Curated annotation (Swiss-Prot):
NCBIfam families: GTPase_YlqF. This is Probable ribosome biogenesis GTPase A. The gene is rbgA. One of its GO terms (biological process) is ribosome biogenesis. GO terms for cellular component: cytoplasm. The keyword Kinase does not apply. It comes from Mycoplasma pneumoniae (strain ATCC 29342 / M129 / Subtype 1) (Mycoplasmoides pneumoniae). Keywords: Cytoplasm, GTP-binding, Hydrolase, Nucleotide-binding, Ribosome biogenesis.
Amino acid sequence: MDTFTSAVKINWFPGHMKKTHDQLKKLASSLDGVIEVVDARAPTLTQNPEITAYFTNKPKLTLALKADLAQTVANSNILWGTLKQGLQLKRLVIKKLQTLFQAKKNQLKAKGLLVHQFRLAVIGMPNVGKSSLINLLLNKNHLQVANRAGVTKSMSWNQISSEFYLSDTPGVFFKRIDEMAVGYKLVLTNVIKREVVPLEDVGAFAFCYLSKHYPQLLPYEGTDFTEFLHKFAISRKLLQKSNQLNINLACELFVSELINGKYGKLSFELD
């Protein structure tokens, strides 16, 4: 099996992310709580402690989406789900929010306030499913959604029930990544744009990771990444105009299919 190293450093922190950092910091005192959306394949890695620190004393629902692609572990602090659940997921989210805010509602009721409207921010890294979740809760395609990182650019408020208003926020990435393994895993969960990191580095890391933890999920055998890609290209009949094997396309397809869950359920949080 290949051992994988790379000297590449990821630095992806667009201007709108800094703006969102500043917005959330200012809004924190006026918000009643947050829904933190993470990727079920890497629920810890796709949290952003720089953002959640603003809401330390607020009720927080952590929702791990794409659970159908993940090898999940029991964790009572996380609600696991998939957007394919539709109304079932909506009911689970609303029920969980009602439970989280029951104590607050009791306090307000004791003060004679019978109508409660709570303002929540939906936070998370790029492309973890925040806008899609709000669309589901609103029962309509209200917010701009695309399967790539960095689509939502501004904040907007939406009523999802008589009690709760939600604001989607642009996905906010770490200001810095010191461990390249973390960066590659975030590419493989589609949090980081693939263009930010050399594709061959991502593919090589993915091959090494699957070889170590999930060898049964690799679509083809290979003693190293080079042999694996050759077998991949031959099996898929990936040829260039010169009739040579298109190794670059093989790498691209391998990474894309892994991101989209074609090979089976997994976790990207194994050592």
